[in-house]
C-alpha cells in the first residue's frame, strides 16, 4: 500500500477523557487482570480541499462522536465478546456494579481499528453527509492508555478497505 498525503490535516483530541476498565484475557501477563485507564483518543482528518468555511473538519460537528465515545468508554467495563468469564461480567452489571460494554476486540490496536472504521464508514457519511464523506477522510485514529502506551490505526480511502469487515 502506498502512503497517501493530504494537503490539509485537522485533529481532534480527547485527552484523558474516558475512564474505563478492561482486561486482555488472552495475555500471559498481569494484563489479563481487570485494570483501568483514562483513555485519550486522537482523530486525524485529511483532505485536499477545504470546505466553504475554509475548514478541513468541523469540530463543532463532532459533538455526537464525543457522546458515542462517552457511551462506550466513560465509566465502563469493556469486555471482549469472547471472554470466557462473560457470565461473571454480566452478573456484575445485573447487580449494578458495572456498566458492561461488549466489543469484538480490545487493546489500543483493536479499539483504534474499530473507531477508524466507525468514523469513516458510519459517522462522517451519516452525520456530515455524502459530500463530506467524499471530501474528507479520518486517516489516523490513536488510542492512548498512558503517556507511555499508545497504538494507532491508519488508512486511506484510496486503499479501498472494507470498513464493515
Task: Locate the predicted segments by residue.
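Charge-rich, low-complexity N-terminal segments
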Residues: 1-165
Amino acid at each position: 500500500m502506498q502512503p497517501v498525503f493530504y494537503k490539509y490535516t485537522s485533529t481532534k483530541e480527547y485527552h484523558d477523557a474516558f475512564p474505563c476498565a478492561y482486561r486482555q484475557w488472552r495475555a500471559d501477563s498481569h494484563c489479563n487482570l481487570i485494570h483501568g485507564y483514562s483513555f485519550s483518543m486522537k482523530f486525524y482528518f485529511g483532505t485536499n480541499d477545504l470546505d466553504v468555511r475554509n475548514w478541513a473538519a468541523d469540530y463543532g460537528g463532532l459533538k455526537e462522536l464525543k457522546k458515542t465515545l462517552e457511551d462506550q468508554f466513560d465509566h465502563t467495563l469493556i469486555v471482549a465478546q469472547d471472554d470466557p468469564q462473560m457470565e461473571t461480567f454480566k452478573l456484575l452489571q445485573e447487580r449494578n456494579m458495572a456498566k458492561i460494554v461488549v466489543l469484538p476486540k480490545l487493546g489500543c490496536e483493536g479499539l483504534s481499528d474499530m473507531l477508524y472504521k466507525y468514523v469513516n464508514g458510519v459517522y462522517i457519511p451519516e452525520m456530515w453527509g455524502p459530500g463530506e464523506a467524499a471530501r474528507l477522510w479520518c486517516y489516523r485514529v490513536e488510542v492512548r492508555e498512558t503517556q507511555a502506551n499508545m497504538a494507532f490505526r491508519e488508512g486511506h480511502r484510496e486503499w479501498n478497505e472494507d470498513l464493515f469487515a
